[in-house]
Amino acid sequence: MTQLPSQMADRWQGMLYWHILLGRSPQVRALASMAQDRLAGFSGLHFTPKRWLHVTTLTVGFIEEFTETDIGNMVAHAKRLLNDTPPARVTLGKVLYHPEAIALKVEPAGALDQVREAVRAAATNGEAKQHESWIPHITLAYSTSVQPAEPIIATLGRRLPPYDISVDCVNLVVQEGAERLWNWRSIAKVFLGSSSKRKM
């Protein structure tokens, strides 16, 4: 921050993401409730609202950079790419710890790679982008203060009871404002394979 800016920017302008939304899954909600109940005694943790439990699949960019036509084309492209991709069976239960968050790992590794590659191709119109490592996860709590991690790990543990779930769709989501406001809205849903016949 050594140079003066020519103009100020909106820190909280809307962002566009592809998310796998899992807030309606009874299994995911049960695991989140179990973890959040165990961690309720700790300050400095911000819990993900159950409605918005999710797997972040791709950060697309600022919403103002996309026209309605751009978004429509991206969604249509994603639908074509995922039309032959069957719903993915994944297992939740292993707890991941990061200095800034506590999450559930999505296993097995690679189970959702086809979904990510499809939405990435749709967002870039097929242009190649540098490969980025991706560990699919569901964040249960975000850290909002500095505190020792060991008591938190000892209380929650390294693994919760395993649950198997089916991932059958991915959502294009607009996030408005500061992250912790959870001012989200889904503007498109793309089903995987034969699940496209289900009601939206």
Regions found by a protein language model. Name each.
Residues 1-200:
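Histidine-dependent nucleotide/RNA phosphoesterase domain, centered on the 2H-phosphoesterase fold
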